[in-house]
Design a protein with these regions (language model features):
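Residue-level recognition of tetratricopeptide repeat
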Residues: 59, 93, 97-100, 140, ...
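Register position in tetratricopeptide repeats
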Residues: 97, 144, 151, 185, ...
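Canonical tetratricopeptide repeat
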Residues: 90, 137, 178, 211-212, ...
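N-terminal leader/linker segments that initiate helical-solenoid repeat arrays
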Residues: 2-124, 128-129, 133
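Structural marker of alpha-solenoid helical repeat scaffolds
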Residues: 80, 125-129, 168, 201-202, ...
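Helix-start (N-cap) detector for alpha-helical repeat units in TPR-like alpha-solenoids
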Residues: 51, 85-86, 129-132, 173-174, ...
Length: 318
């Protein structure tokens, strides 16, 4: 009996020891798991807050270095959290700013694509108070993308997003000018004139005056167009813009059937630059309207010799 009792006691103690060993190991495992999650929470919350804070801080520097820092930091956040809204917005902002200053056209296009993708993704779940600025930056990005590509494929998107920003109360000095140029490329003359006129109240420039004159010419309001061209002649020192203004004035005179003054404008340009394709083309139009097709075609041949793909001359010589 004593032997059996002693054996049972031995096994009982052994089971108790095994129990406590297992319990201790389970406790250690539980503590390790808890520690892991606590560290992860700390890293995700505290360190992520530091990263987001640095986005605002570096963006407010308004420098190339600041934009580069925002770009890299937002990229790091998005690697772990692809739909982090603040990171998406700032990645879009910084990509655009870097694209604007990039001298390599291909790199600039890649950055613009990043900007547009990030901003469009950010729009899906952003705060209502942030949405107007995202729309504004999207409008700017599409405008610059169209400018780089030398086409107007994106003008409708520029108008769409900038108007969304304006309708929500967003204000920026460059919006009227961007809208004016985009409406012009879409052939919406009335809205272009309205936007350019608003831009003129913000800051007058010779280029803006020329663009307004061009739109009034397209709208067949020639007397108003000439008034703006006079202001260009009075204020501009940009030789290229002045030549474009004389070309436009020559076109206005042709529309008014004032062929002598139109000829004078084109000859004025050719006295300074005999290789002006547009001036030779304009002279050809004057000769054609006077009934002298031989002289007209001679001028258009000169035009094509200078600029082989001049659309107007190609059409006339076809």
């Amino acid at each position: 009996m004593k032997g059996r009792y002693g054996l049972e006691l031995y096994y009982h103690k052994k089971r108790v020891i095994v129990f406590w060993v297992i319990a201790s190991l389970s406790g250690l495992i539980a503590i390790s798991i808890l520690s892991f999650f606590l560290v992860k929470v700390f890293r995700d919350k505290v360190l992520n807050l530091d990263s987001v804070s640095s986005l605002y801080k570096n963006w407010d520097l308004h420098t190339a270095e600041g934009y580069s820092s925002v770009y890299e930091t937002s990229l790091q956040i998005l690697e772990n959290k692809p739909y982090h809204n603040t990171a998406l917005a700032f990645h879009g902002y910084s990509s655009f700013m870097l694209a604007e200053s990039e001298t390599d056209n291909m790199k600039s296009q890649q950055l613009l694509d990043e900007a547009i993708f990030s901003l469009r993704t950010a729009k899906r779940n952003c705060r209502e108070d942030v949405l107007p600025q995202i729309n504004y930056m999207l409008g700017r990005a599409y405008f610059y993308k169209g400018k780089l590509s030398n086409y107007h494929y994106y003008s409708d998107l520029v108008v769409k997003y900038l108007n969304l920003a304006v309708d929500a109360g967003y204000v920026s000095d460059d919006i009227p000018l961007l809208l004016g140029l985009s409406y012009a490329s879409l052939g919406d003359t009335d809205n272009s004139i309205a936007a350019f006129t608003e831009a003129l109240l913000v800051r007058e420039s010779d280029t803006l005056l020329f663009n307004i004159a061009k739109q009034y010419c397209n709208n067949e309001q020639h007397s108003v167009a000439k008034q703006y061209l006079v202001r260009v002649f009075e204020t501009s020192e940009n030789e290229d813009l002045l030549n474009k203004s004389h070309i436009l004035l020559g076109q206005i005179y042709i529309n008014e059937k004032n062929y002598d003054d139109a000829e004078a404008e084109y000859n004025y340009i050719l006295q300074k630059d005999e290789n002006s394709a547009d001036a030779h083309y304009g002279l050809g139009l004057v000769h054609e309207l006077r009934g002298d097709n031989i002289k007209a075609r001679a001028e258009w041949r000169k035009c094509l010799k200078i600029q082989f793909n001049h659309p107007g001359a190609l059409k006339k010589m076809a």
